[in-house]
A protein has these predicted regions:
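Conserved positions within compact, well-structured domain cores
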Residues: 1-131
């Protein structure tokens, strides 16, 4: 869990107070959890792709359905970092013993696909999901 202004904040998927997807798109939408991204990395095929001149990743499920995730990088202030890589926030806050609280994110870079921790001050993409 994550302590946010003295409030113990567990995973907040679907809570419009903290979940930008629910707040902006409505109650049917939410940010994916860390566990959902871990499942995506384990059971889907990911490959670099370009769609409408945008570099990113094609994610194909076991049933053959696929989505495209653009490689938008991150933003800090006015600086765009890691353009071409995909950083997708989860709704799962994490405590790193050495440096405080971070947000879990899915990182796609070339053929490297993993879950990592992202500083809260970095802007990363959000890929909303719905049931």
């Amino acid at each position: 869990t994550y302590l946010y202004y003295n409030v113990d904040l567990p995973d907040f998927s679907g809570d419009p107070q903290y979940d930008v997807a629910s707040a902006k798109w409505g109650a049917d939408w939410r940010m994916p959890t860390r566990a959902e991204y871990e499942e995506l990395l384990e059971y889907c095929t990911l490959e670099q792709a370009t769609l409408n001149n945008v570099s990113g990743y094609k994610v194909t499920g076991q049933n053959g359905n696929h989505i495209f995730l653009p490689g938008a990088g991150t933003i800090c202030g006015t600086n765009i970092n890691f353009e071409g890589d995909g950083y997708y926030l989860t709704s799962t806050p994490e405590l790193e013993e050495w440096d405080g609280y971070y947000m879990c994110s899915m990182h796609l870079s070339g053929t490297l696909f993993r879950i990592l921790y992202c500083e809260k001050s970095y802007g990363s993409s959000v890929r909303p999901v719905t049931e």
